[in-house]
Amino acid sequence: MHKFRQKYIGDKAFYKRYLMLAIPMIIQNAITNLVSFLDNIMVGQLGTEQMSGVAIVNQLIFVYNLAVFGAVSAASIFGAQYFGKGNHKGHMYSFRFKLYAALLVTAIAMTLFITNGTGFISLYLTDTAGNGATEVALAYGKEYLEIVMIGLIPFAVTQAYATNIKETGQTFVPMVASFAAVGSNAVLDFLLIFGIGPIPKLGVAGAAIATVMSRYIETIIVVLWAHKNRDKNRYLEGAYRGIGMPFGEFKTIFIKGLPLMLNELLWAAGMTTVTQCYSVRGLSVIAGLNIATTITNLFNIVFIQLGACISIVVGQYLGAGELEKAKDADNKMIVFSVFCCSVMAVVMLLVGGFFPQIYNTTDEIKSLATSFIAVSAIIMPFCAFTHSSYFTLRSGGKTLVTFLFDSVFTWVIVVPVAFVLAKYTALGIVAVYFLVQATELIKVVIGYFMVKSDVWLVQMV
């Protein structure tokens, strides 16, 4: 028992450092997801077709968001280690890489959405009821996408800045910027969706406009703070005096980061493909999944952000050459993450059924959403472990391994299971959803042996 405690349980100082880093990130994402939840409810009050149209577009934006995240994460592997080593110039080059990569991804995404947005939305619409509801949902989806695209550029810029700021251990400022953005989004949503006083009722278009405006607010706050506090953001020294970076630096980040960039993109595409497989069961399934996903995201933030903190803490230890400290911290953080998420899973099981009742939709959709939430709660502790394993492997630059562990697993195991069960069996959609989610157990076993092998204990800078 003493050995177990020594290996997997830290002291007060350890948890204080971990939580000081994690809590602002958890709060930031909690507020963001809470506002997304409120936004979802407000759009849901307009009708099932409006809610479904917006939900489908948000699936497409999800792929874009993860592609940007992958682009900046490629350089973040080096950024955390550069900062840990005190190499501010290297940190600056990693920032440039992030900015260029995020803007390139944005340009590609906007081109695809402009030229084939209708086709992408249509992939998720199957008219099983024969009442024309899918055509209405398509029209609302197109309206939402055309406006929300305007907010992609500020999102890309924010990610480049915010990730570099977090690598220096300053998680408070991105949190404040996020508060301002989501707060304004909530207020603007209410005013523009329903129309208050002289402001006209804009419905779905109002939700899109509110999202775009909040993106710009967040970007302005993050960028202005970073440039006004150069002493805390040394990577900005000379960041805009030139546009290039040493070929050696670029090559190293690109080669190490390419699997990670592809991983985020392919994983997100895989998840949306799974949703598309579910969508053949009808519009009610898409609506139920939308509600369940919105609620689940509120609870998932704990393991997502605790996992992200692993990459920062372990990355800094690795950059400083303290490999044993990195291994020790990793063991303790993984156990802590799984414990916290087990508690969250119990809470989610107990209260999850209340949330779908808030929506203005059919009893069938509410029932489906409640079942999907229960399944997600059961699987959550396993997701916490695999997520922690992913960030452990990533912190040591094992991007090819993370590529195989994450996106290849999704496309080789998860997508085929969802495709076959949804299209070629008579199983109910809840049973299909449970079996697809249960594939996470296979990933737990793989993650355990990968982390235990210590293949990630590498100093790269």
Pin down the residues of each PLM region.
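Generic alpha-helical transmembrane segments of integral inner-membrane proteins
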Residues: I26, A30, L34, L38, ...
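Helix-terminus/linker motif at the lipid-water interface of multi-pass membrane proteins
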Residues: A30, L34-S52, I121-E135, L191-L202, ...
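Short alpha-helical transmembrane segments in multi-pass integral membrane proteins
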Residues: M1-A22, G79-G151, I199-L258, V314-I379, ...
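Transmembrane alpha-helix boundary and packing residues in multipass membrane permease domains
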Residues: M25, N29, I41, N58, ...
